[in-house]
Amino acid sequence: MPLQYGLHEMSIATSVLDALRAESALHGGARVTRAGLRIGELSGVAVESLRFCLEMLVADTDLAALGFEIEFAPWTRRCRACAAVFRVSDARPECTACGSQDTEAAGGDQMELSFLELEEP
C-alpha cells in the first residue's frame, strides 16, 4: 500500500520549504544543503508523512539534494517544586523525581526548524 500523506503535513512541508528559501535569499542565494526539524510528540504531525511530503516537494527543484533530519521531541514536563524535567509516559503528570503534581509543560508540542546548513554561492 502506498504511503499516504495528509493535507496538514503537506501544508507544513510547504511552509518549511518557504522558510528555507527565505533564509537562502537572506544569505545572498546560498544553497541550502541540510535542514533539521524538531517535531514534538504532541504536535499532531505524522513524521513519516511529513518526510514523504518534503521529499515529494523538493524533487526536481533547486532543493532536490537537500538532506532533512527530523528529530522527535518527547512530551516533557517541569516540576515547579524541584525543577526536574521528566518525560511523560502516560496522562499522569506527577514529577518522577519528587512526586509533586505541581508541574508545567516543558516540551513536546514544538514544531521548529532546529538547524540549517548553507553553502555560499
Residue ranges of each PLM-predicted region?
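Long, charged N-terminal interaction/targeting segments
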Residues: 1-64
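Long, charge-rich boundary regions
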Residues: 2, 7, 112-121
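Short loop/turn motifs enriched for small/polar and acidic residues
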Residues: 38-42, 71-75, 116
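Cys/His-enriched microdomains
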Residues: 77, 93, 111
